[in-house]
């Protein structure tokens, strides 16, 4: 087997489109360009992680042995980290959970008051009639 090419984060950052999409996973670099349309999770997932170390995202989802076999065919190199390079910050995506805004106060307090008053009135009437 031919020696694998070494890729830095700067090298990976040049491959972030559908026409050229590379991912680093567990220290290996994969050319996923030809696999984009076949990816079961959809192309958006791959494009969101393109050009960076996607190890954490890859493991968070979990992948089958078959997926790992496919990866071996996409292997193009090794990922070399340089201490002077900072990992690219993950951009917010549509799959990123958003915080749920706090509920706004409503007039349900007055409804609760009316219901409580109706229950008390019902109890008083029931006691008087029995």
Swiss-Prot record:
InterPro entries: Cyt_B5-like_heme/steroid-bd, Cyt_B5-like_heme/steroid_sf, Cyt_B5_heme-BS, Cytochrome_b5. Residues 4-80 form the Cytochrome b5 heme-binding domain. Residues 80-107 are annotated as: Disordered. It is a single-pass membrane protein. GO terms for cellular component: endoplasmic reticulum membrane. SMART domains: Cyt-b5 (SM01117). Membrane bound hemoprotein which function as an electron carrier for several membrane bound oxygenases. PANTHER family: CYTOCHROME B5. This is Cytochrome b5. It comes from Mortierella alpina (Oleaginous fungus).
């Amino acid at each position: 087997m031919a020696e694998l090419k070494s890729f830095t984060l700067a090298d990976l950052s040049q491959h972030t489109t559908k026409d050229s999409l590379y991912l680093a996973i567990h220290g290996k670099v994969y050319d996923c360009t030809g696999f984009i349309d076949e990816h079961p999770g959809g192309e958006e997932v791959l494009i969101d992680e393109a050009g960076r170390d996607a190890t954490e995202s890859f493991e968070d989802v979990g992948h089958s042995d078959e997926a790992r076999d496919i990866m071996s065919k996409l292997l193009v190199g090794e990922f070399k980290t340089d201490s002077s390079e900072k990992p690219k910050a993950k951009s917010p995506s549509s799959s990123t959970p958003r915080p749920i805004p706090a509920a706004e106060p409503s007039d349900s307090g007055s409804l609760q008051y009316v219901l409580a008053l109706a229950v008390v009135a019902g109890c008083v009437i029931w006691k008087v009639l029995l």
